[in-house]
UniProtKB/Swiss-Prot annotation:
Its main location: cytoplasm. PANTHER family: GLUCOSE-6-PHOSPHATE 1-DEHYDROGENASE, GLUCOSE-6-PHOSPHATE 1-DEHYDROGENASE G6PD. This is Glucose-6-phosphate 1-dehydrogenase. One of its GO terms (biological process) is pentose-phosphate shunt, oxidative branch.
Length: 153
């Protein structure tokens, strides 16, 4: 994301909000990422701007409270404007169903479009892949769903 932001390849204004079970802060994430970012001295100001656009919410994958906190954070970030939301799910397949249900119930943008990107193995086999596809189809329109499967092909 840093490289996309650095190179002006993201629409303006783009903001980022991470969500996971880990009890972290944005500062913790920044510190863990530093060695991978390859920031040049002349990019330092832009790098600081990038981190000002980042937020993080910690919560469970199956309860409502964390997703309600995520929704509140995204609303604060949007500042009452129209916002499109991209939910990028790099999760174990075992939690896809609960997470996507909570996103649908609680976290969708009411004023912009929504997209859900599913990364990782898309199921364990043909049967579980179809089950996941059917589940997603019950929640989202096909044009809202993007699948990235490292094992396809």
């Amino acid at each position: 994301l840093w490289w996309l932001y650095r190179d002006n390849l993201l629409p303006k204004p783009t903001k980022f909000c991470g969500y996971a079970r880990s009890k972290l802060t944005t500062a913790d994430i920044r510190k863990a990422c530093e060695k991978f970012m390859k920031v040049q001295p002349h990019e330092q100001q832009r790098y600081e701007e990038f981190w000002e656009l980042n937020h993080y919410v910690s919560g469970s994958y199956d309860g409502r409270l964390g997703f309600e906190m995520l929704q509140q954070q995204m609303e604060i970030m949007e500042n009452k404007g129209v916002a499109n939301r991209v939910f990028y799910l790099a999760l174990p397949p075992s939690v896809f169903n609960s997470v996507t249900v909570r996103i649908k119930e609680i976290c969708l943008s009411k004023k912009g479009w929504n997209r859900v990107i599913i990364e990782k193995p898309f199921g364990r086999d043909d049967v579980t892949s179809k089950q996941l596809s059917d589940h997603l189809a019950s929640l989202f329109d096909e044009e809202q769903i993007y699948r990235i499967d490292h094992y396809l092909g």
